[in-house]
Every structure is written in C-alpha cells, then in structure tokens.
Amino acid sequence: MLNRRALLRNSAAGAAVLLLPQATARAAALRDGRFRQGVLSGDPTPDGITLLTVLDDVEGKGSVALEVATDSAFRKVVARKSIATSAAAGWSVKARVTKLKPHERYYYRFETKGSHSPVGRFQTALPADSNETVRFAFFSCADYTHGYYNAYQLMAREDLDFVVCLGDYIYAESYHAKGKTGVRDDKIGKTNSDNPGIVREAVSLADYRAKYALYRSDKLLRDLHAKFPMVATWDDHEVQDNYAGHAPRGGLDASKHYTAARKAAGYKAFLEAMPFLQTGRSRIYRALRFGKNVDLVMLDQRQYRDDQPCGDATVPPCPGFDAPRDYLGRSQLDWAKRRLASSGAAWKVIGNQAMMMNAELPGGNYYGFDSWQGYVTEREELLDRGDHRRGLLG
C-alpha cells in the first residue's frame, strides 16, 4: 500500500513524472475502483515512457497512486506520484515518466486506497549511439467478434522491445454475431436500419469508451500490454469504417449517420485509452528513434485526408483517380519528408494504417481506394526521394 509520505518523496526518487492534461488537478486519493483494463505503457524513449490505466467501478473524482521501480518487488523505487482523474476523463490515469536510464527494464503499478493494479513492465529505448538489434511486433484490425486473440499470446512469448498497433485497435461497428459469423458478441452501441450489414455500432463517447473496456476484457490482450510498451496509431474503425476526416460528412453517404460529434467522441476515447506521448490536441503523428538501427515514423492517415476517389469502390481506376488529394495533409506530409530525409537510421520504418502498394485484383479491379492507391500523388511525393529510400520500410 502506498502512503502519502511515500508519495511526497517523489522528488528524491530519481525519475520525474509529468502529469498529462487530464491529471493536473489536486485530488484526494480514491477509496474505490478496480483495474479491469489492466495496465499499459507506451512510446518508449531512452529516458522516458508513458504509463496508463483506466479505472472501473468508481464515482466522484480523486487520485490514483503510481509507482515505478527497477525490480518487480518494488524495493528499488525510482518514481512515485499521485495522479488525478475523474469521470470527465473517462477515469483514465496517464502520466509521462522521464529521467529514466536507456535500455533498462522497469516495473510499475497503480493503486487506490482499496485496490491495486496488476504489475506491468517496460524497457526504455536504446540510446542514440547503440547498434544493438531492435525487436518489435505489430498488429492491427483486431475485430473482437471475428476471432480470438491467440496472436497476442504468441507475441508475449517473444523477447521484444515494444509492439506497434497500426490502427483498428477497436471496431466501432460489430459485423458479426456469436453463433452466426462471429466467435463472440459485441452488443455495444445502436442498431442502424440503414446499414443491415452492421449488428451494432458505437455512436457516443460512452459507447467508444465501452469498446476499449470490452476489448481489454480479453486476458491475452491485457497480458501483452503488461509485458511490452505499445506504439499506437488509429485507423478508421476507432471512429467509423472508411471515414475521411477532412471531407464533408466524413466522405460517407447519409445512411452512415456520420457526424462531427461522433468523430470527436471516437478521438477523445482513443486519447484517453492509449499510452502515447501526445504532441498536440489531436495530433498523433510522431517518430521514435531506437538506437542507430530503427527510426519509427508513425503516421495519421485518417484525420487529414480528403474523400476517396471512385466512390471508394472495388472497380478499375476511374477518371481522375490520380488527381491530387490529401491523404496525410500538407503539414504532416512535409514533416514526414523532413524526418525521413534527415534520419540516419539503418531502417526507416513507416507506421502505415493501409497498404502502400497497389492491390490489383483479377480483371483489373482495385481493392478499394481507401489506401495509398487512392492518393497516388502524395505517395509519389513521399517516396520519390533518393536520399531517404535506402532502408525504408512501410
């Protein structure tokens, strides 16, 4: 049990804890709450990490204790802090811990007066001058109803530095019902008679928050998070299938019931639920360096894009399909070009949410234009640079 005196010793513990926006207010320690969603770490740097948990079964507002140590028994504590949370933040508890040692393993836990979280662990990133091998795995498109999370169990057995989520961590829509086309049920959200292929879909902030709780009810996912840091981005299903964030009505027809409020709810739930180093109100594109070998460039391919060409259909390229249109948006595209051009890493890894290459089907049809193949002008501008092609993966 962490006590007030121990928390006040934080300044002498060795590491520093930066409280993220939802955790800046003073609050008394919470007496209740459960940690059913487990613990998460993310965006490791040589000297820092973001730590997160989300409380259940709690009311009012208050604070949660965070403790970071170099051993699993917490005899060698390097950081302690009390973090405020409330219903307005979805009971998300998030902090950035800094002044850590490069490529070191640490352990962490959260606690209220009546409950404590599982213990998580993480390893900070390699220092800039390190030539050591970097090991990571990635996942995406994790529809809860469509299959079990056995792959997470296999990942957790590996010796990894971190894992990458390339988007679709949740699915706002449930397309499958247990016993029919699905292996388990997701009954969150509302039905939409205009979309008979969808069983239910999230439309409110409460719905989107409930999605993260449902997906993390799977022990294999919680165990993966407790073992490795995650570097995450979003794709479309964190809001709505195939929406285009910079297009009127999301580029969707009226039957999809897309609204700006729905997008805002999806974004807020994601920002509450994911352990990453946020650099702006809703900016999630960023880059992380791992020694001399890996520069991981995480993109946002939803928020700034224009509508897909050709009605986003599975058809041959239509007239004007290769006309200039935004996919990353000018600011992000210029940032990515500068980062790739200036990176001296052996491998420059692009965190893509959709395929970079064309997906041409028999008969000359393209498998939709939601990916880079619908935004060829930006793709060519990003890749048509000899100074950063060497060692480029995406």
Model segments located where?
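Terminal low-complexity, poorly structured segments
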Residues: 14-16, 26, 96
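N-terminal secretory signal peptides and thylakoid transit peptides that target proteins
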Residues: 1-15
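C-terminal segment of classical bacterial N-terminal signal peptides
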Residues: 20-24
